Amino acid sequence: MKWWKLSGQILLLFCFAWTGEWIAKQAHLPIPGSIIGIFLLLISLKFNLVKKEWIQDGADFLLKELILFFIPSAVAVIRYKDTLSQYGIDLILIIMISTLCVTLVTGLLTELLLKRKGSVQ
């Protein structure tokens, strides 16, 4: 019975993802459908259209098995080793610079929001 419950919960999560993909495609949005699906799930949870218990076990299972979702990326790295050998240093620099930018902007925004929140109190 547990597998049926788990399968149903995962199916419900995928329904949100598929709905988000459909909305993104139909509306020609530049936002990934999976992000729209997560937002739809958030709204559904916030307004109690979907209860946390309905998806908890399925979400926990997917998080535990998250490493399986990275296997295709690892295979792609191996498959395109010629491209990586040609542009590898450039890609590493781009990844490092973009990570640094994201970290700095996140830190600055966090400080700004904390200062603003502190001044309100």
Swiss-Prot record:
Keyword set includes Transport: no
Membrane topology classification: Multi-pass membrane protein
Subcellular location, record wording: Cell membrane
Gene Ontology biological process terms from the UniProt entry: cytolysis; killing of cells of another organism; programmed cell death
Transmembrane segments: 7-24, 28-50, 62-79, 92-114
Keywords from the named record: Cell membrane, Cytolysis, Membrane, Transmembrane, Transmembrane helix
GO cellular component: plasma membrane
Chloroplast in keyword set: no
Entry-linked InterPro entries: Holin-like_CidA (IPR023760), LrgA/CidA (IPR005538)
Role: Increases the activity of extracellular murein hydrolases possibly by mediating their export via hole formation. Inhibited by the antiholin-like proteins LrgAB. In an unstressed cell, the LrgAB products probably inhibit the function of the CidA protein. When a cell is stressed by the addition of antibiotics or by other factors in the environment, CidA possibly oligomerizes within the bacterial cell membrane, creating lesions that disrupt the proton motive force, which in turn results in loss of cell viability.
NCBIfam families referenced in this protein's UniProt entry, alphabetically: PRK01658.1
Family matches, as PANTHER family: HOLIN-LIKE PROTEIN CIDA, HOLIN-LIKE PROTEIN CIDA-RELATED
Family per similarity comment: Belongs to the CidA/LrgA family. CidA subfamily.
Protein name as catalogued: Holin-like protein CidA 1
Species: Bacillus anthracis
Organism phylogeny: Bacteria, Bacillati, Bacillota, Bacilli, Bacillales
Gene: cidA1
